[in-house]
């Protein structure tokens, strides 16, 4: 019973379609055993919605076996008929085979079956994977209801799946997305209202679509009206999620009536519709109607005929007329419209009077497109406009700015071509017409995803400021572009302050009180291969052109909107997906609502709209009118057309100071003590505003971690977080710099024009090349600063020039000559950078100690040509703009220009011959800029786009090449259905696919099979109904030609067959007839394979779909080649090339394989070893060698051996070219099946002297891989040359003798030197020994005996006693008198005395010595003192 229960459980697990080892998506456990409401059956597939009957579940339980055992036993004892006996034998055999069969490790799902031979699942058409758990093909669904799913678990990488739901023509079908989780902006599910991708697109789902509530009203739902629906899913190779579970039904009310009504059949048609509950209206009962009876009779009245319900009395507003006028709290409302021309995204809107003008935008289908829309904010109705408003081509991602009843539209992406434009057009509201402006100075970037504002500067100029955006040629733009409305000119502003990073899809607002722009978020690239969303907030002051970094929001997003209400910037919606390798739950579409307090630099999160409807979106527009924000359109997988209205809290609704101060968040109110009124931020006085700022400053909390984010001095000191710069890093102001570092706390003190700071802000090669101080590093795809010493010591790189200021006192001509000595010339200060640098350097030099006593008025390269014309040394005219003449200048006496005091920025005219202090020299920078590759946007073919590197991506259906860091910015609404990189390009159209399987992998293709019954056909653009004819011309203007059904391209009457869901069973590629509908009878035309899809050995080509095979072209050096490419597998080592037409010259092989072969050149007297053991060597069966004798009077010996048998042929020729080209080789040796061979070739027999270029050829062939071969040629003499011997012998002997003499002499010198050193050390040692004097008494015979002391009469004593080590022995020295002559006089020449020494034993005499010493002490008083002496 336990086993049976386990079997039943395993069967049930297979029916569920997943096992416990398979990761189930979020939410499965809650739904996995939910009973089916309609049938009471069990639901084993939660995502699929499949219900199994109760009968089936009972059948899966094991039957009772005990009552049947006796019956079974009796049946076994009965004799079996022959047929039954044979069946039993067959069953036994099959049982034995089943015992040997392999079982699949995991159960097969989705209709797959386990193959007992391989132990692997065999999947039905459309399913792939080890368990058939992933979709991977096309499906056709015909039921009146059903489900669409990618399979259990996470979907597969690089997946393409297509579902065709076929119903009845023009019958309404509803698709309900119960679960959907894919990678945002990269993995899409497209829904078409028809039977092909050429039908109208109605949705492009991506990201995490999770209902905001548990109710049914927020789950996405798509309505299809044609009776057909095509769903196509594509995923890339980044990361995958749990996929989707979609149910469809032809008889279902919208959103199941949102749970607030009943679904009933319509009386007038066969459709169904909702009968809403009380207080609910709308097609799906999702609109509140007359809540709280509109507060009747005090606040309003219910209008049953109006979908809006309440008609509020004066002084009341909001849902149910529950909020007074002015509003004491904020609230949301929603207006829904069904006009097909309204849905759009990435449009722009402005308000003029009571009219909201909406211009441009992206739409799925352009049949009902209107370029300009007008919305009456008072009546909440859309207005009708003239058809002339559509005279401009469709675009999106542009900018709008309003000025005096004129709407200025700039940039954007042209939808029909995919190009980004730099057009500036003006829409005149009064006559509803467009005018194209042609600026005088065209120095602007073509951008998309930017913003623009028209402002009046303090100088009175009216300009349009274009902020950031993405340019396909220059990447993400970080500059501010200015258009002067009066001068009709463009310019790029040189801003100051923080170095900000521009991006795509940010929001920006202009605050009239602070005269500043506030820019938030966006999609940004921080290098060519690093990009992400941003949460930055920047402030740009329009008069000072100063950027300041404010507190970031910590909410990353792009394609959101912002407006300013009473000193508060309100931010709504956007795309918040910021995951790159795995999902962290960030959603594509957001309804986040945030507020930024301008005065306090503080963010707060506001409640999301509570509208009983999903309002998540991005790419919408937002405008402000009478403190009310209007949000229109956007994208949330579907294009939206509703209007969200947010009415903010009003300051004047608060009557007390406490309530006024506590107002918000979302509004900033100030209490006016004089009038005792609560006023908004815009109406506050300067004193009130400053007081508020000071209060906020005292309460603010600093985020010290933000300081670490700044990598340059400018951004570190131009922010609101109190940071300061310490040499090379930014730290909080309460952290001191370390010793030796300089602290910079103010922006003005930062070193200006440091290229290390701003080069890394450039994200493309072209933008990097615009600045001569930067260079592009192609390996790391980043912009880096040029080295500081590129100009040399003392020179400074400024732009593309090197400048140097000297202090020498000289006249103009000498200064010019001094510059020329450095290959320079006097500077032409024609750019702002040069002027600023020179003036700054002069100020620094003037303040330094070394030059403080000098008054520097340096010469510059400015001269007077005639009476009224001055020009620079580079011949450019002087314009008196960057530098200006001082008052009363130029004087008539001067013809040369000098700089006056640096603070004045002025010029003076001086006499050219007068010597003055200083000169400014200039020379070109001596570096060459690296050439940039062709920008991705200018590459028009896939091969060109993806060939060089991974920096570009090719979108196949859009036929566009984009930067890899701009894919999301280029296709924000899923326009790209499939992309390619790194040399992987598809055919340009369907006709390029040669097999049906490859054809049906493309969602827009179908297969037309010819009548030959061989599987031959053609791939054509088409739908389920048949082929379609593509338009012959591209879209022009706002006219988009659509493909039309053309069945004549595949006529069924002519026995052609159109396949759109599955391929025909016969797939023999036109090389064989099919038997049993699918088996190729005999592959002909040199083909082989299950479907005759490859060429036979020795032939190559593409035999698919009737293709031909041709012989391998290998020039006789190979018999096999790659069956697809034709690349030959050369059999001779040293021969290479696609057709074996080249020799490996780089490896010492030479020859001509077109007329002969290749040979390895051997050196004489060297042994060579060739090991052919690599996988690339498996086709080699031959190798050839060539050798030429070095000596003409010696024989040539050779030997060769190998690890395997081989054939050997040796020939010779009079020269190498003769042997390879004319065939004049003479055979010498021919051996077969040998392993070793030796031979000698006589110089006399082969006449080496008369054939100086004689060459021997060795042909080794017929061996097998792997093999090791050794070969050598050598020349040795038979008789030794005696003369040479003796010459060599004596030369060696004399050389050795000379070496020995030199060594002996060196040794003697070393010995003598060492001996001298030793003697010197001995003398020093002897001189350092202790010494003393001794008295000697010489007795003579005439001396009276009494004159000699008694002590001398004792035993003679030694003059020295030198103890040895251990005091056992000593050296005793005494005076000895030598024999004397007559008179006691020694002989002449002699002293008569000698010193005698002897080694004596003192071990036994030491006590006596000590005794004598003690006796001497006792006798000191008895005897007079005497000198120590010795008696001889």
Curated annotation (Swiss-Prot):
GO cellular component: extracellular space; plasma membrane
Membrane-spanning residues: 1283-1303
Domain annotation C-type lectin: ranges: 798-922
Extracellular side: 87-1282
CDD domains, alphabetized: CUB, EGF_Lam
GO biological process: cerebellum development; inflammatory response; myelination; pigmentation; regulation of multicellular organism growth; response to oxidative stress
Source superkingdom: Eukaryota
This protein's UniProt keywords: Cell membrane, Disulfide bond, EGF-like domain, Glycoprotein, Inflammatory response, Kelch repeat, Laminin EGF-like domain, Lectin, Membrane, Receptor, Repeat, Secreted, Signal, Transmembrane, Transmembrane helix
Kelch repeats: 355-405, 406-454, 464-511, 516-567, 569-627, 628-674
SMART domains, sorted: CLECT, CUB, EGF, EGF_Lam, PSI
PTM field: Heavily glycosylated.
Domain EGF-like: 100-133, 249-286
Gene3D superfamilies hit by this protein: Kelch-type beta propeller (2.120.10.80), Laminin (2.10.25.10), Mannose-Binding Protein A, subunit A (3.10.100.10), Spermadhesin, CUB domain (2.60.120.290)
Pro-piece positions: 24-86
Residue ranges that the UniProt entry lists as topological domain Cytoplasmic: 1304-1432
Record's disease association: Defects in Atrn (isoform 1) are the cause of the autosomal recessive phenotype zitter (zi), which is characterized by progressive hypomyelination and vacuolation in the central nervous system resulting in early-onset tremor and progressive flaccid paresis of the hind limb. This is due to an 8-bp deletion at the splice donor site of intron 12, which results in aberrant and unstable transcripts.
Primary role: Involved in the initial immune cell clustering during inflammatory response and may regulate chemotactic activity of chemokines. May play a role in melanocortin signaling pathways that regulate energy homeostasis and hair color. Low-affinity receptor for agouti. Has a critical role in normal myelination in the central nervous system.
UniProt-recorded name of the protein: Attractin
Organism: Rattus norvegicus (Rat)
Source species taxonomy: Eukaryota, Metazoa, Chordata, Craniata, Vertebrata
The encoding gene: Atrn
